[in-house]
Amino acid sequence: IEFTWSVWIYIDDLDYGAGTYKHIFHKGNDDINFTQAPTGLNHPNNGPGLYITPNKNNLLVIMNTFENIEEKIIVEDVPLNKWINVMIRVENTTVDVYINGTITKRHELSGVPFQNYGNVYMSMNGGFSGYTSNLWYWDYGLGTSHIQSIVDQGPNMTMVGSNMTESKPRYFSLRWFFANTGSQQDAYGGI
């Protein structure tokens, strides 16, 4: 089993959601805080899951295996107020966590990673205070040159949906609803 996840994150405030884990993304079920006291962690499926730990600038990677439902990897002291790239690379039972193209943690899983058929969720329960960019998945372990090229490209800085007035979709216009002219052209705002 091999795969790689890559995401750019910008954390700007650790006080947001104080005392709970802050969700970045996970692949699995949608069960955050539904069956237990609110912690911010999804359970049981994290294949993988990436979170910010409570009250510290640490990242938590959770990976399910057939031997252990939650194997946890902590990456300490990630930078605040700047973009960082986080990659989770799995080959067989080895998990490598990269920060900005450098391996910061290597963890040997107790068993084969458990792959689930769940969806990918981002920023659940309000996520974290900051930004996310370019969440990518590959069904193989990326090599060092590919990892470095992703870091060199940097995050996508284009905001999606940041200003609804720029797009001016016609279905927000009331002209089509209130027009009484009988003309389809007038009723639909001049189509």
Walk through the language-model features, giving the residues of each:
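Extracellular glycan-associated modules
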Residues: I1-I191
